[in-house]
Amino acid sequence: MGITLIWCLALVLIKWITSKRRGAISYDSSDQTALYIRMLGDVRVRSRAGFETERRGSHPYIDFRIFHSQSDIEASVSARNIRRLLSFQRYLRSSRVFRGATVCSSLDILDEDYNGQAKCMLEKVGNWNFDIFLFDRLTNGNSLVSLTFHLFSLHGLIEYFHLDMVKLRRFLVMIQEDYHSQNPYHNAVHAADVTQAMHCYLKEPKLASSVTPWDILLSLIAAATHDLDHPGVNQPFLIKTNHYLATLYKNSSVLENHHWRSAVGLLRESGLFSHLPLESRQEMEAQIGALILATDISRQNEYLSLFRSHLDKGDLHLDDGRHRHLVLQMALKCADICNPCRNWELSKQWSEKVTEEFFHQGDIEKKYHLGVSPLCDRQTESIANIQIGFMTYLVEPLFTEWARFSDTRLSQTMLGHVGLNKASWKGLQRQQPSSEDANAAFELNSQLLTQENRLS
């Protein structure tokens, strides 16, 4: 009897001590620091187990800040449930079902520490040295939404077209969601970069004095959606794999048609312009399509020849809507391939990303014995080789004609960057073992690039 009583007292004592303990094993503790320790421990376990990290907002410090903002969280909730609760706004973002739901955006999460810096950057959104990679980090991966919304406001489009700001933000969020973050290059950050470049071109004196609010609206929407739902492979890949998109668009501007139709779908789904007459909405959709279709790199010579012809004759009249639309098409084409026109630090990052996407396609083609597309074989190609050919045969001819049309400081800056970046890549190329055959290789590949590649 005495021994039994002692054991009972010992068990009661152990239970009482356990209930008072703090730290990673205390699920009854109301101490937020203890909950944070448990959360960090769970993150470490997930990383060791090989779980794929979430694309955005998964940093423990961000989660911890959200935890502090939730004053009504009960202390008895387990660490696992806390993590689920804190991540729910990310799950909402990935679900089309909840697109209209009111949730705390990641921008709100970062207001205190980062949003001030992001706003400061937006004050210089017209600067050609704008660092879209830094801006994307400061906005927690929401660069496309933040930048485009700001530009709509900056150009007075919200007031002019009487846009519902909730619908506008929802439309921009849908656009951003429909870009694939797993694409190294054709993702929402690229779309944001192109949109920022388009804004710079719209500010150029010739355009700024002639474009209408309608022109600006179409240009910004087309820039933001020009690669919408890009699969990360090029048109020839879709054709040789009998992809349904190639069949649907009869092997002609397959990706560009898909980007355009996807943009139209989001425009209609958002209801952003539902207050406009049907004729205006139809005209908007058609003109956005004409802008996006102009980014098909296989039609580069067609657009460039027409533009050059007008410049030679001196008959471009920007009071003519058709001529103005052609110039906007050329502006979007420039914005789409302006990476070599940025400073070396930015340009090099873009070069590495697009080459990674090329090589990923080549890896798939090798795996399934499809025949590797030009510029997509990581065993025979190099970033330097691809970039030098790209600049020589596509970028320089386009931006030379653009400088004829708009001979400004920006145009000379862009051409200057192309020259410097090309020289830098040539320097790196000379260090490569196969550099002797580089000239012939990139000339051939660049001609093929114009016809079919560039993952446009």
Swiss-Prot record:
Residue stretches making up the PDEase domain: 110-432
Main location: cytoplasm
Protein's pathway: Purine metabolism; 3',5'-cyclic AMP degradation; AMP from 3',5'-cyclic AMP: step 1/1
Stored SMART domains: HDc (SM00471)
Subunit and interaction comment: Interacts with CBFA2T3.
Record PROSITE patterns: PDEASE_I_1, PDEASE_I_2
The protein's Enzyme Commission number: 3.1.4.53
Cofactor remark from the record: Binds 2 divalent metal cations per subunit. Site 1 may preferentially bind zinc ions, while site 2 has a preference for magnesium and/or manganese ions.
Binding residue positions for a divalent metal cation 2: 227
Reactions the enzyme catalyzes: 3',5'-cyclic AMP + H2O = AMP + H(+)
Cofactor(s) this protein requires: a divalent metal cation
Cellular localization per UniProt: Cytoplasm, Cytosol
UniProt function note: Hydrolyzes the second messenger cAMP, which is a key regulator of many important physiological processes. May have a role in muscle signal transduction.
MF term (GO), any: metal ion binding
UniProt protein name: High affinity 3',5'-cyclic-AMP phosphodiesterase 7A
Active site: 186 (proton donor)
Major enzyme class: hydrolase
Family: Belongs to the cyclic nucleotide phosphodiesterase family. PDE7 subfamily.
GO biological process terms held by the UniProt record: cAMP catabolic process; signal transduction
Coiled coil: none
A GO-annotated cellular component: cytosol
Known tissue expression: Widely expressed with highest levels in the skeletal muscle.
Organism of this sequence: Mus musculus
Keyword terms, alphabetized: cAMP, Cytoplasm, Hydrolase, Metal-binding
Domain notes: Composed of a C-terminal catalytic domain containing two putative divalent metal sites and an N-terminal regulatory domain.
